[in-house]
Structures are given as structure tokens and as C-alpha cells.
Amino acid sequence: MIQTTNLTKVFGARTAVDALTLTVHEGEVFGFLGPNGAGKTTTVRMLTSLIAPTAGTARINGFEVGRDDTAIRRSVGILTETPGMYDQLSAQKNLTLFARLYEVGDVPGQVEKYLRLLGLWERRNDAVGSFSKGMKQKLAICRALLHEPAVVFLDEPTSGLDPEAARLVREFVAEIKAQGRTIFLCTHNLDEADRLCDRVGVMQQRLLTVDTPTALRRQLYGRKVVFHLREVGAGLPALLQSFPFVKEVEQVENKLLVGLDDPDAQNPVLVRALVQAGADVQFVGELRHSLEDVYLSLIQRGTTE
Amino acid sequence: MNKILTIIDKEWAEIFKNRLILYTMFLMPLLFTALPLVMLGAMGGQSAGDVTDMPPQFLQLCGELQGTECYQLFMSNQFLLLFMMLPLVIPATIAAYSIVGEKTTRCLEPLLATPISTVELLLGKGLAALIPGVAAGWGSFALFALGAWILVDSPALLARLLDGMWFIAIGVVGPLVALAGISVAIMVSSRVNDPRTAEQITMVLIIPLLGLFFAQIAGVVMVNAGLLWALAGALVLVDVGLVWLGARAFQRETILTKWK
């Protein structure tokens, strides 16, 4: 659905995007993570044919950036960093104008459908300038979907929203994902990426890595199991370390953190050994690193390399 | 064509909510129409005075008109140039707001992300600015013609007040001046961040017209049909160059990445 090969953008002496090679599959929610100035917005602008790449190629929906720009703009929807609505005009007028520019067949029908879907129908005649930030963001999402695009680019969709509005937007993103659309989601909100994205890519001028959030955690930290004991006896860490499949054992207060490849199969063996050694096992769980840990670690690596 | 009409619709929907532009669109034409009519009305029935105070070239242009009528024609002709300025002032104000305004409201990126071409966008914005300006010029002249028909008793003076020269000025030179103003506004707006700056720089175009205005008052130049056709011809050349430069200056990428 989205395919880039060595996509590069240079502004003067500064390389904003460096040889980005990436594939985003149909129906996938792809999270595009990276610090400010990492080249996320520049990438989105290239993929939506707003700016031309300096080098490399990109194909969206089978159309090539730089050659089929109008076709690309017709087939993608974009939510820009700031909603950018005409504040003096009503919500309905705003959407009607964009529906006409996107050559939508049934303009009034599509406008009504999306205003109702996002709970803005009752306020359709109000000037957008009187809307809250969350309402403007919802209206901008409506605008991005009016022409029913197969690919939707969302640049920081929940940025600056209060928790309730942010949740509404996230729920709506999940809904449009369920409709089978491909979503390219730029975000700083790693919790959001964790919840919504099938895969994430971490960007810092160049693409540092791409994988599922779970695989990224494992790639960086492996899998760790926490054994909560009533008390950690003196020989217990060594006992666990004696198993060939145990990678590492770390004691933190009354917990033993054990690195394993296959906890489903290996946990029962270790629990049995601990019980036989007289330990009181209170409970066992997998240690989950947040996507934030993974992200920060990758960015730090990317900076030092 | 549909996209051009959509842009015009959007521009006008915004214009009619912007008081500053509305005042410019309605007050200035009313003022420019009222002044010559008040002057015509006030001078009617007055004694002739010494017509030799007027530029000698103008006395020749008066032809069979004598005394007060010659004065009335002379004074009305000064306003001819003001009527020509209307189609410049109004579109320049609208164009400056409509183009730079997209940036200040951060609407330009979503707009450029639609399948609209640069030509359609500029044509839509240009026409949205040009039509009210030209309409204001023509409307003002129609009001002036109606007022003159009511106020002026002399058929000879009325015929001279509404002769072909005025139609060249309002119908041909005015729209060409407006087109020049819009092209300059587009060029300036691709370089500046503030609509007022774009408007002020565009207004520099008024200087040659004001120069013509004062030159006529001083008797250095007499505006006549020949001069207006020459001016129209020059403006066609200038417009072709300015439209080309304006379209080139409107670089989507530069505007998106350099406008802060």
C-alpha cells in the first residue's frame, strides 16, 4: 500500500529524511515515531505529494510520488499537525468546500455522515472558530475521510487534546482501522502507538527500526519473568541460574527477574524447582517494558551511532 | 472548473465575514462616486469664472463646452483616474488576505493536499479578488452615470462626461490594473508572512496611477482615449509578465516549508 525505497529529502545542507526504505501493508496501522525534527512530517508531506523527494522513490496505492501526484492526493486523506480550518465558516461549509475539492459524489450526504459520526451534526451551522480544540481536531479528521481514502495519514492526532477528547479520537482511529483502511500514524504518544499500531517504525532522519511493539520490546530487552517470593533465600538465584535455558537472574528485593526465551514452557520448570527448594512463590508475571523505554533506548542508540 | 468555483465560493464566504475588506469594498466606491457627483451638483448654476486658469491642452479638449461646463468636465476627468484605482485597491486587499491568510490560519497545507492544481488554485483566488474589484469599479461608474444624468442639464456636457474614454478607463484599463495588483499580491504573499505587509507592498502599484492623476492636475499630461489605449497596451504586457512571475513565485513546496 505504501512502499518507499531510499526516500531522501535534503533542505540546503540539512538532510531531513535519509534513505527511508519502508513498506506499510494494506489495512495496517503503522506508527511512525521519532523526536521533534526527526523527519516525520517531511516524510508524510512527501508521501502525500505535498513536497518532492530529493532522491529515492515512493509508491502509494500503486501511484508513484512525483509522477502521479494528483492521483495520490485523490486517494489519500491527511490530518495535518494543526487542524487548519476556516474559523469564520461553519463546520458544514468547511467540509462542503473540501468535499467539492476532493470531487466527492454525494457532497451533502458525505458531509452529514461524518459530522454525525463524530458527534458534530448539532453544531454544523456554528462557526468553527467557536469550537474547542478537540472539536476542531474531530472536524479535521472528518475532512481527511470525506472522500473515503484507502490510506489515511494522521500527524499527531491527539496532540494537545484533553484526555477525553484524545480517547474519542483514538476510538475513532480504531474504528477506521476496522474499516480496513491503511493508517500511517505519526505520534509522540507512545502509549497511543502501543494501543493502536500493528507495527511501529522509529525515525531519526533515517529509519532506526521497524517491528511490532511486542517484537521491539523483545528485540531490545528479551523476555523477562518476575517471580515474586515471600522471601528470597540465599541459594535461589544460583539455583535458577543453573538451568541452561536461563539467560540471566537478577534479584530486586523479594523478586527474582529471570531472562527466558520461552516463558510458557520454562516457567513451570522454574516454579517447581523454587517450590522444591522451599521458596514460597506468591505469583509469577512477565515484566513488560513500556514502548517508551524501547523508543528512548533506540533514539539514544541512534544518536550515539 | 468546479474547483475554481469552489475556491471562489470559499473566498467570498470568508470575504463577507471580514469587516475590513467589506468596508474597503463598499465605502471606497461610494466615496469615489459621491465626490464627483457632489462637485457636479455644486458647480451647476455657478458663474463661469476665468477658464484660462485651466491647462491650455484641456481648453482644447473642452471643444464647444464653455465656462462652467468646461470646469465641470475638467474636474470630473480628475475622478476618472480614481475610478481606475478602485479595481486595484479592492483586489489587492482581498488577494493579500486570501493568500497570506491561508498561511496564518494554517489552512494552506490541507488545501494543497487536495487534488487541486496550482493553476486552479491561483485562478480561483485571482478571480475571487478580481470580480469584486471590477464589479465595484463598474458599479461605481454606473452610479456616477446615473447621478450625472440626473444632475447635469446640458446634453453636451453629459455626452462628454459619459464618452468612450470613460468606458476604456473603467472597462479595459481598470481590470488590467486589477490583474497587475493581484499578480503582485500573489508574488509578495509568497515571500511575506503578514497580510498587511502584502497589501501595503501591493499598494505601491498605485503610485504610477497617482502620478498620472497629479500630472493631469498640473497640466503635464492630458488623459484622453489615445493615452488610455496606450496605457492598456502597456498593461497587457506588464500583466503577462506579472502573471507569469506570480505563478512561478507560488511554489507549493517553498511556501509549505519556508513559511513559518
Regions found by a protein language model. Give the residues of each.
Chain A
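ABC transporter nucleotide-binding domains
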Residues: 2-4, 9-204
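Non-catalytic surface loops within mature trypsin-like serine protease
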Residues: 26, 103, 122, 231, ...
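Short beta->alpha junction loops/turns
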Residues: 65, 230-232, 263, 287-288
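Residue-level detector of short coil/turn "hinge" positions at structural boundaries
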Residues: 106, 122, 247-248, 275, ...
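Residue-level "edge-of-site" marker
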Residues: 128, 254, 287
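ABC transporter nucleotide-binding domain
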Residues: 170-261
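C-terminal coupling/interaction segments
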Residues: 263-305
